[in-house]
Amino acid sequence: MIDSFEVKPLRRNFREPFATATGTWRTRESMVARVKYMDGHVGFGEVAPTPGFRGEMFSDAHRFLSLWEPRMEIPDHLPLCRAALGCAGSSLWRTKTAFPKIKTAALLRSPEETNLPLSNVLKAKIGVGELGAEIATIENLLTRLPAGSRLRLDANGSLSRTEAKAWLDTFEGCSQIEFLEQPLAVTDRNGLMGLAESNSLALALDESLLDVQIAEEFLADGWPGYFVFKPTLCRDWREMETFLRNEPTRCVVSSVFESPFGFEAVLRVASLVETVAGIGVNPLFVEDDFSLHAMDMVLQPGEVDIPQLEELWRSI
């Protein structure tokens, strides 16, 4: 049972404007929920509205959580509030055994970066500029990848079927590309299945997976690719954890620029699968009191522990 509940808003600035297919980010706004249970355990969850993903506005979430009490139902139109409270109640906050270490992918601010991170897996956003120019940029990037590294391409659902086919045809059989993430809009399920079945280059679902039920439907339909889960945006944590445990080699855990509270939760979830996690936060933010996690290529869930998060919470 819940003993107490609190919520606090946060605001962090990116070092540089961050461009995606849905626009340019300069500031990250979120809210952190702290839940203390009658047995003394504490859990945290973060409401982190993210452009391009379904979810309530920051103002709506803040208004609701400011008045929320443990016995109140969370309405369907507030999935991020559900996600945050589900996260706070996860058993991963209570785990006493050591978590396995997590290998991480490096997110490029731009595929034209000259000093590439020394990571085995890098991620580049596409669908931001003109098709031909972007393909040429990625071709150039592949010539500069560290030996043995792989590249993930993330379109954020911005491509048409014709554009997606152009990407797949260009890089057909390219072993340096691990997968093309969410090439088509969430609503184009037939298009996604068709692309996945007709090309050797692996695809991954991302924006499509805010509900575990959708992942299960794709799995039942024979989806051959990857499933990218953003736990902070997933409304049912218990179902998500079960799915990840059942598909550890095909699920990728990804972050959405959380504060240390949400980021630590994502790290702990990433310990459930065997793939390289799509996470990375601090290098993109201005250095501040929230820079608790090291941004190494290998991270240790639990290294930032509950007492440290409690101390940070009190400082907000």
Question: Which residues does each predicted region cover?
Answer:
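Catalytic beta/alpha-barrel core
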Residues: 107, 122-131, 150-157, 175-188, ...
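Long, acidic, intrinsically disordered low-complexity segments
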Residues: 25-35, 207, 211, 215, ...
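Loop/helix-junction capping segments adjacent to catalytic residues or to phosphate/diphosphate-binding pockets
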Residues: 52-55, 131-135, 158-162, 174, ...
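A structural micro-motif
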Residues: 3, 102, 119, 148-149, ...
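Short, polar loop motifs at secondary-structure junctions
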Residues: 110-112, 187, 283
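Distinct, well-ordered alpha-helical segments
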Residues: 132-144, 160-172, 189-196, 214-221
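Shared catalytic-loop signature of beta/alpha-barrel
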Residues: 60-62, 67-72, 191-194, 198-202, ...
